[in-house]
Amino acid sequence: MLRRELNNSISNRSIENESFPFERPNVSYIISAEFDNKLGPILKHQYPKDIPGFNQFSHEQRNGNTSVSMNLASLMIPSSIERNPGKQDITVFTLYYNKFTQNYQLFPVPKDPRFSFNLHHREQSDGSVTNSIYYDAENHQDAKNNRYTIVLEDDELECQEVQNNQKAIDNEPLFFINVANTVLDTTNDRGAVIKSIAIGTPLKTFFAFKNIIVLVLDLYMKAPTQAAATDILLDCFNMLNSIDLTLINDIHSKSSIQEVLHSIHDESIITKVFLDPDSTLKKLFCINGFDTKDKYGNIVTFHDQLIQYHFTRFQPKTLPPFLLKIPLQFNMIRREPIYIENDYNELVLKFLDKFVPYLLKAGQKVNAWKLVINSTKLSKEDLCAFILSLANITATYASDPQSYFKGNAALIFPYMDISLVDGLRAYVASNSDFVGCFAIIGTANPIFRYQLDIWDYYYDVDEGVFYENNSPEKEKPDTVAEVKIGPNPLRKIFNRPHFSTNAVNESQVNLGQKLFSLLIDEYHDSDTIMSVLRRLNVLQLENLLDALKRREIPPNIALKDEYIMFYKDFFIFPEFFDYFTLHSIELLSNLDNCLFSLGNTCQLFSTEQIYSQLSQILDIVKELFRMVSVSRTNIEKFLNACLNYSPFKILPTAQLHGDNISRWSFESEVRQGFDNFNSYMGIEKDPHGVIVSAIDLFTQIYSFDILAFFLTFITKESGQDLPFTKSLSRRRTYLTRIAQSSSLRQFLQLSTRPNIRILGGNGQGTGNSNYPEFTNASSVISPKLRASPLLERRASKICYAITKLLYRLECHPIGMALLKKYLHNQLREAYLESKRHFISKKGDSTNTSSTIASSSFAGASVPLSSNESGMLNGLKQINEQQESTLETTQKED
């Protein structure tokens, strides 16, 4: 191995290290590769040190096997890059840190640290790992060629402090974004020079570095000498680490508010958040000002949704000054776990439309699959972005805390070279955790199609064709061609194996497929597509919860696993499986159904029945107020639930599954449901309104109208002062009521009570066609309330509780904008009138009540499981803590 020791001039020139000590570097490694005409792709440089596990010197010293770095280099020099000289291409790969071997590797680390990926005995001075046996999947091949790597080591970076800082981040996966290019060169025997540069970072926003790396690669390839090329790498590494990204990392780490922003697709609200003079942005993210600096003194500016870091403190030694004028930009809205620039309609929707039928066909007998996606026409950047898009909608890439199915994450490999096939086989064979797991692998080589033992489904993007692996013994395809050709392994690769493109039964259709086809035909933007997928996830989750209540539930059921098995939609959004969000969705659904039941002209209720319904509505609203009063995070989670909830009047037949759903039209159902909803709410249809698509109607925000709808039941003419509000100002009385409304027994009755949907003879939710006419519910309910003082007092209490709930939401910067945008004019007027009546007169008591409500919910800190048994245990703990808090408060009084 060639080893270049940096002279003292590098240490003297690297004065940035004194100013920027890299406590937590933005970029952990910068590496380069090139294509050697004799050796193929090779690693050329690694900085600031060789990556653990990819140390060329140690491998050659042991056994001459250098395929580990060769496989890494093959990812950096992708196939066919020489076909487009002067046009850069991008690949993405991840290195996972193995705490047991203290090395990085290309495949995820097994849960059991005793099983890793290297058959070689490690000879290290560290007694904790000496003589440990591990299997290296990347090092599976016998490679006899020598590989040469220049390991750049800066003495100052090798100090103990830097080593400690490096160890602190070593346990995180490193995301590498790699830029490769080809430059024609007549002096080269190949006629061209192929080189690449990659940076490894623990940040999932690694695509933000793309533009800078592209420019640096151009300078690197034009460097007149090898020394100048290495200096460019050093300068780039120091420049990217000369800024402090704490601010954007903090903004992205606020998951609850990010989920709300992700669910907002109205540009006027986004503009309000980021550009309004009231500084909503400052309130949300606790930003002191729009003209600020990082801790190193670099200027940080804000532009629309972007935060821009300027390299104002860095002094380049080799890089040209113009490069420093390009700011590093990050979107403050973290729309996906991995930020990418991709067209979901072009690739992802077509994939879902083709793949979901195969999942439905497999049914519950297949709990795992391995998927290979191949394209020779897409650029590697588009291919990687496609695979990462699929990773985003399954939320299982790299260090994501959520699992996809039964506690296991999916293996996501954005781009895999053919040289890694044996490594993949070894990984699957040696990893017991992989049994029952999922894999999504991107390739640009059709040979993968014939490797039957590594895939269950193969998708040819270029041809738009899916292949299903039907071989009973995938590792031994018995083909006629094999008999004729013989056992030659090279020729055997091209045998046509047992796979098929069998058509899927058209009757196996779910709601997702109907939406996929409609989205493709109408060509909506990515925000609308993601909104539809999220709304569908919530809608089907709500129906699944209803179904689970009607049958016996296993004690250790995982709701997310049940959802994946039941709907087979591929995509999933874990934030909706949070207990608080689930409970919010359920309460919204119960409130929606109660209101519909009260205003339904097809049913006649006695005064007692109406009072019972009103009591249930009051319990629901009180429960919601108690929940959002706990913390700002709870408000944000509730707002996110509201933004993604669809009332069952819009799509009541969404709970149909299988054959039934194929016989109705999504468009006609949604349009009829929208008209019924407006009629029920008393909202007049605008004769001059713009005709919108069914998708736009489906993704409209209805929840805030549902919350405020009851306020219209108490007419202004009644004008009665509400005597009950006086008692609410007394601390003990209010606390007692809150505690009673949130007792475990009442909560379980509320949660397990069947939905109050009007059921048909078959027990299914009745469709829109069964209701030929929807009338304004206010005109039906208001006379009933005025006819009974008892009911009117009960209704007044509900109005007061609703007003407090809406006011609590309005106090949040985002909640204020959402209510202003999505509350219909008539309902907004009713809310403002109610707020003037209650809040302005009882401002002090409201604030006191809010504080008490927050303190009364002491169980907010209790972690709750998505399992049924775990959820019940968590609720019991909450109830016990609430009763304890109540007793303590009463003693103090």
Curated annotation (Swiss-Prot):
InterPro entries the UniProt entry points to: Actin_polarity_regulatory, Afi1_N, Tripartite_DENN
Subcellular location, record wording: Cytoplasm, Perinuclear region; Cytoplasm, Cell cortex
Keyword Coiled coil part of the UniProt annotation: yes
Region of interest (Disordered), ranges: 841-893
Coiled-coil intervals, chain numbering: 152-172, 872-892
Residues in uDENN domain copies: 28-335
Biased composition (Polar residues): 863-893
BP terms from Gene Ontology: actin cortical patch localization; cellular bud site selection
Principal cellular location given in the protein's record: cytoplasm
Tagged with keyword Oxidoreductase: no
Signal peptide: none
Regulation: induction: Mainly expressed in dividing cells, but not in stationary phase cells (at protein level).
Annotated region (Interaction with active ARF3), positions in chain: 25-488
Entry GO CC: cell cortex; cellular bud neck; cytoplasm; nucleus; perinuclear region of cytoplasm; plasma membrane
Chain ranges of the cDENN domain: 365-492
Protein's job: Involved in actin patch polarization. Required for maintaining a proper budding pattern in yeast cells. Required for proper polarized localization of the ADP-ribosylation factor ARF3 at the plasma membrane.
Family: Belongs to the AFI1/mesA family.
Remaining remarks: Present with 768 molecules/cell in log phase SD medium.
Quaternary structure and interacting proteins, as annotated: Interacts with ARF3 (in GTP-bound form). Interacts with CNM67.
Name of the protein this chain belongs to: ARF3-interacting protein 1
Species of provenance: Saccharomyces cerevisiae (strain ATCC 204508 / S288c)
Upper taxonomic lineage: Eukaryota, Fungi, Dikarya, Ascomycota, Saccharomycotina
Gene: AFI1
